[in-house]
Regions:
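Charge-dense, helix-prone N-terminal extensions
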Residues: 1-124
Length: 124
């Protein structure tokens, strides 16, 4: 079961990430680009995810993943029930979302330093 504290610990370990409280949501971003957002009740995590892959992700585990809110459908974004995620899955989702908003050289350097295959796709 993942929590806001897990999101915070993972996200703030990623280069250039800053945390911001916007409204009641806790957001993690690089510069002005948000890549993760936790709802005020800490039940939902929104995160960057390729638009063309999100329907398949949601269909694969509908009890865990949800499409973005209608206002966010134009973005590369999807939502998850935070307590349904295990910490390792959360880590992979956040790293993948972060890689979408940082320069490719920074992402590649970080992934290499962590022994993560930059060619892997999605959780798992």
């Amino acid at each position: 079961m993942a929590t806001l504290d897990d999101v915070r610990r993972i996200a703030l370990s990623l280069p250039r990430t800053t945390e911001h409280l916007v409204g009641d949501n806790t957001r993690f971003r690089v510069g002005r680009l948000v890549y993760a957002s936790v709802s005020a009740d800490e039940e939902r995590l929104g995160f960057g995810f390729p638009k063309e892959e999100r329907a398949a992700l949601v269909a694969s585990e509908p009890a865990k993943f949800m499409m973005p809110l209608p206002a966010d459908e134009r973005y590369q974004w999807v939502r998850a029930r935070l307590p349904a995620l295990d910490p390792e899955e959360l880590r992979e989702l956040l790293i993948d979302a972060w890689c979408m908003v940082v320069p490719k050289t920074i992402a590649a350097r970080y992934l290499e330093s962590q022994g993560i295959d930059p060619g892997r796709t999605g959780p798992g």
